[in-house]
């Protein structure tokens, strides 16, 4: 959520930022007008309260002098009723303001490139060379089906489209990757591991920015008004909702594995085969709470932590700086890590690493105290996939496939696979 004071003081700048994003559907002038009404009423309330105090002081004085206080008491009663009515008006205005503010996206950082689609993202760096084959490589879903380790038909029968049943070595590979990623981020990168709930309440979804705008993309449990987590970012960030963190605790670094659930509304026809776009998938997520002055340095570190997974697995990738049109609702700045997928003949997103600045913190009211003598401020929040597990499985099946249909297991995870070096058909 944007600070209303920031909008009021820099209205033209905020309008220009929204224009950079190509965003519409909300009225910045309206929210500024509502804020003006709110502040005017609050001034009236303050004046009435001061008058109320002055009048209340007259009562004991008049009583002491033996004079009638009924007129003064009636005036106090009238002032009290007027204040109560104005308080109701302020609450109504604030609710209208919040309704608008919750739908306004974050302001892009000045270094975010201008653009409309992912074609306008800017490549920052690459690692490794695209995998070359002496044969025509198969897409990962064919590799998995031929090996008997991915069963899309059974998953479709059990549930529906965009679900996968992992069998045998695929299930072991998925589990191995989750453990490998968690161990790397805790043991080498200093994150604390969490295992959060896989369902969250509405306040949590609002806090991280999924609601109200993206409710159609969420899986809801209507009996409780709970939501299946679209990402571990939601429960982990909301641990500190409405809390004040002591400054000496920052930065706080968490890593969490969760299954993720997304309806993928609006993605019909995109990546309909394989593991790339599923309704349910596993992900290891990195989340940071940091001081504002440190947030961009911490974003670089977080991105480095995520890409280390791919380096150890030996998977070629690139990092791109995301343009305004592809930035997403909550981020001020974002990197995507894209892994090379031979069957696509292109790089495919496997991680997004974002700095939200104080956007989520304002929505979730997450503050910190810089030191014992300072006023509280909003923290900056960051997160990134470290990594999307299903897409990592897909990348391994594609990049390490052999001409005989087998798949070489990356050396870094063989200890998690009971020493198996290769996946072969049974």
Curated annotation (Swiss-Prot):
Keywords: Aminoacyl-tRNA synthetase, ATP-binding, Cytoplasm, Ligase, Nucleotide-binding, Protein biosynthesis. GO terms for biological process: selenocysteine biosynthetic process; seryl-tRNA aminoacylation. Its main location: cytoplasm. It catalyses: tRNA(Ser) + L-serine + ATP = L-seryl-tRNA(Ser) + AMP + diphosphate + H(+); tRNA(Sec) + L-serine + ATP = L-seryl-tRNA(Sec) + AMP + diphosphate + H(+). Pathway: Aminoacyl-tRNA biosynthesis; selenocysteinyl-tRNA(Sec) biosynthesis; L-seryl-tRNA(Sec) from L-serine and tRNA(Sec): step 1/1. PROSITE patterns: AA_TRNA_LIGASE_II. CDD domains: SerRS_core. ATP binds at residues 262-264, 349-352. It is found in: Cytoplasm. GO terms for molecular function: ATP binding; catalytic activity, acting on a protein; serine-tRNA ligase activity; transferase activity. GO terms for cellular component: cytoplasm. SUPFAM superfamilies: Class II aaRS and biotin synthetases, tRNA-binding arm. It is an enzyme of class 6 (ligase). Consists of two distinct domains, a catalytic core and a N-terminal extension that is involved in tRNA binding. Belongs to the class-II aminoacyl-tRNA synthetase family. Type-1 seryl-tRNA synthetase subfamily. HAMAP family: Ser_tRNA_synth_type1. Homodimer. The tRNA molecule binds across the dimer. NCBIfam families: serS (TIGR00414). Catalyzes the attachment of serine to tRNA(Ser). Is also able to aminoacylate tRNA(Sec) with serine, to form the misacylated tRNA L-seryl-tRNA(Sec), which will be further converted into selenocysteinyl-tRNA(Sec). This is Serine--tRNA ligase. It comes from Alkaliphilus metalliredigens (strain QYMF). The lineage of its organism: Bacteria, Bacillati, Bacillota, Clostridia, Peptostreptococcales.
């Amino acid at each position: 959520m944007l600070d209303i004071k920031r909008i009021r003081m820099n209205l033209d700048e905020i309008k220009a930022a929204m224009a950079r994003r190509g965003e519409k559907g909300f009225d910045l002038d309206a929210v500024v007008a509502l804020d003006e009404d709110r502040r005017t009423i609050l001034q009236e309330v303050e004046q009435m309260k001061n008058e109320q105090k002055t009048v209340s002081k007259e009562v004991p004085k008049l009583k002491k002098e033996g004079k009638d206080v009924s007129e003064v008491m009636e005036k106090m009663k009238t002032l009290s009723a007027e204040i109560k009515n104005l308080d109701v008006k302020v609450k109504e205005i604030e609710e209208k303001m919040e309704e608008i503010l919750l739908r306004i996206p974050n302001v892009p950082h000045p270094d975010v490139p201008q653009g409309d689609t992912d074609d306008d993202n800017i490549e920052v760096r690459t690692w490794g060379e695209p995998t070359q084959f002496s044969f025509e490589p198969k897409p990962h879903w064919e590799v998995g089906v031929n090996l008997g380790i991915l069963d899309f038909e059974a998953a479709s029968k059990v549930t529906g489209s965009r679900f996968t049943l992992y069998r045998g070595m695929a299930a072991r590979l998925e589990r191995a990757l989750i453990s490998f990623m968690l161990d790397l981020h805790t043991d080498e990168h200093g994150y604390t591991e969490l295992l959060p709930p896989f369902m969250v309440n509405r306040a949590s979804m609002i806090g991280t920015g999924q609601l109200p705008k993206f409710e159609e993309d969420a899986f809801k449990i209507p009996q409780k008004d709970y939501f299946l987590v679209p990402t571990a970012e939601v429960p982990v960030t909301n641990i500190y909702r409405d809390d004040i963190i002591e400054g000496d605790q920052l930065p706080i670094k968490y890593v969490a594995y969760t299954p993720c659930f997304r309806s993928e509304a609006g993605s019909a026809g995109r990546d309909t085969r394989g593991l790339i776009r599923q309704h349910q998938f596993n992900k290891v997520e990195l989340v940071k709470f940091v001081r504002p002055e440190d947030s961009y340095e911490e974003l670089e570190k977080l991105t480095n932590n995520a890409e280390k997974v791919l380096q150890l697995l030996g998977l070629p990738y690139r990092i791109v700086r995301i343009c305004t049109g592809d930035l997403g609702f909550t981020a001020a700045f974002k990197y995507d890590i894209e892994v090379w997928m031979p069957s696509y003949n292109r790089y495919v997103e496997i991680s997004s690493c974002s700095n939200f600045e104080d956007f989520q913190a304002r929505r979730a009211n997450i503050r910190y105290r810089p030191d014992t003598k300072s006023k509280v401020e909003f923290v900056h929040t960051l997160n990134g996939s470290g990594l999307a597990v299903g897409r990592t499985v897909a990348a391994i099946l594609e990049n390490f496939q052999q001409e005989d249909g087998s798949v070489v297991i990356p050396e870094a995870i063989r200890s998690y696979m009971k020493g198996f070096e290769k996946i072969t058909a049974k």
